[in-house]
Regions:
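Bacterial N-terminal signal peptides that target proteins for export
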Residues: 1-13
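Bacterial N-terminal signal peptides
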Residues: 10-22
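Boundary of Sec targeting at the N-terminus
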Residues: 26-31, 280, 284
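Short, glycine-/small- and polar/acidic-enriched structural segments
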Residues: 28-167, 172-175, 191-197, 213, ...
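Short, hydrophobic alpha-helical packing/hinge segments within bilobed ligand-binding/sensory domains
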Residues: 73-74, 92-93, 181-184, 199-200, ...
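Periplasmic-binding protein-like
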Residues: 111-120, 204-233, 237, 245, ...
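Secondary-structure end/capping motifs
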Residues: 235-322
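Conserved C-terminal helix/tail region of periplasmic/extracytoplasmic solute-binding proteins
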Residues: 308-352
Length: 352
């Protein structure tokens, strides 16, 4: 009897220990991931993954940190003050890596897919209606607003010039933020612009300029923005970085099922618009229904060919010495591992 009681006691203790361990595991605190955002619709994957509980399902807690631009995320990514963020692959990014700032491009965040020209070449209405502007060749001698020096939009303008048989320097770039594009076009300070949504739609509604072409028409699939990981996040918290990527890819696939006909008009469109109005700086649901949204690869694939084209442009214009190139800053292993777990993207089928 004593032996039976001892055995029963040991069994009870083991079961109790197992249950306690299970409760402890369930109660384990979530891993915090600090993510840099600019609050625009291009941050949709972060917002969707949070709203849909994809980060929570991976045991992650998202800490969103707002920045004025992606460029300002570079330094904190390198120091570990920021784990992930979104930004453009610019001259500044290449030079930061050259100086020893540790970060990697790990997935697509925005590209100009067919029908999804999130940015456009706008031309003053007066020039179009008068017949002075009819083709890309008519960019010669014009003042074209672009949002900054040493960024992909310079390469975009260069591609537009090439379509007209022109070269860099045949048009005059005028550097100004997107918020300055509407008044500059309205008062004739510039003749044309490379402008992102929603500012592009605002300008067209204002009536000062017309959309000559979406960027997807003259520079298709340009790698416009990317998901960045800081080196400390990669080296010190790789399992967490992989969990983040799984949640990100799930969100990107949900986002893709919101797209149809160059709008957020797919099956998931209403829910994505609802999420964007909650999380982003733009709160107008009706505007989201009419603007052209960005394309994001459902597998997170990075367009290395586009990055190389832009890098070559920066090098040819003397902005880079070429010592650090696209292959030095891209790490596709996280996206590849996440996609391997989910399988190929099938429209309308949630990644689980």
């Amino acid at each position: 009897m004593d032996c039976f009681r001892c055995a029963a006691a040991r069994l009870f203790a083991c079961v109790t220990l197992a249950l306690t361990a299970g409760v402890a595991a369930d109660a384990a605190p979530a891993e915090t991931v600090r993510v840099g955002i600019i609050g625009a619709s291009s941050d949709a994957p972060f917002f969707i993954a949070d709203a849909k509980g994809y980060f929570g399902a991976e045991g992650l807690a998202l800490e969103l940190m707002s920045f004025d631009s992606g460029a300002k995320m570079v330094a904190p990514l390198g120091t570990g003050d920021l784990d992930a963020g979104g930004g453009a692959v610019s001259v500044g990014l290449y030079n930061a890596v050259k100086r020893g700032v540790g970060l990697k491009v790990v997935a697509d965040k925005v590209h100009y897919g067919p029908g999804y020209g999130f940015a456009s070449l706008l031309v003053r209405k007066e020039l179009v209606e008068s017949g002075k502007f009819k083709s890309y060749a008519d960019l010669k001698g014009l003042r074209v607003a672009i949002s900054g020096v040493g960024i992909g939009d310079e390469s975009v303008l260069n591609e537009a010039l090439k379509r007209g048989g022109l070269k860099w320097g045949d048009a005059t770039p005028v550097y100004m933020g997107f918020a300055q594009h509407p008044p500059a076009l309205a008062n004739g300070a510039v003749d044309a612009s490379i402008t992102n949504e929603p500012t592009s739609t605002f300008i067209q509604r204002q009536g000062s300029a017309v959309r000559f072409a979406g960027n997807d028409e003259f520079y298709p699939n340009q790698q416009t923005a990317v998901l960045l990981y800081g080196e400390p996040f990669i080296k010190n918290r790789r399992p967490v970085a992989l969990k983040f990527m799984r949640a990100y890819i799930r969100a990107v696939r949900f986002y893709n099922d919101a797209l149809a006909g160059g709008r957020l008009a797919g099956p998931n469109g209403p829910e994505v618009i609802s999420i964007l109005t909650r999380y982003s700086s733009l709160k107008d649901a009706d505007l989201y229904r009419v603007i052209t949204p960005p394309a994001i690869d459902p597998n997170g694939a990075v367009n290395l060919e586009s990055l190389t084209k832009d890098w070559q442009f920066f090098k040819d214009t003397g902005q880079l010495d070429g010592k650090v190139g696209p292959s030095d800053i891209v790490d596709t292993s996280f996206a590849a591992e996440a996609v391997a777990a989910f399988g190929p993207y099938v429209a309308g089928t949630p990644a689980k």
